[in-house]
Amino acid sequence: YVVYNYDQKIWYVGSLARTSWVDRGVYQYPMATDSNLVYNHEKGNDNDGTAFTSFIESSPIDVQDGDQFVFIRRMIPDVSFDKSDTGLSNDNKQAVFSLKAQRSPNGGFVKTSTNTVNSSTELNHLRLRGRSFGLRVESTTQGVNWRLGTPRVDLRADGDR
């Protein structure tokens, strides 16, 4: 497949075993066929009733070009679960936030803080220090549709210990 993202002006290329397609218009969703099966695409949050992992992951984020160690102690997650399946309780509408710390560019990520977030989570307390950080948000719960806003972190300058 080939996808052009008009907003970011970039192309995505991948593979998906489908032999014919019909766009939405006559039908509510795009449809495709493969191996004598017809698939509805872009419908729901799951893979035909089975949950799959959805995630977004950042590249390393430097603070002061990586010249300063910083300590992260709190995070406001800013995630919305508004379009999740209506039968799910608020406790089941959740995503996992993983913050990873890196001491040097070639050293790899050494520490991780993992926090489960649901629709009532306003603040996460954590302890993580490094020169740069990576963020991954993921969900593996069936029926969950999440949207990431702008997470905020409370960070302070820290020494090189």
Give, region by region, the residue ranges found by the protein language model.
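Beta-sheet repeat architectures centered on beta-propellers
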Residues: Y1-R161
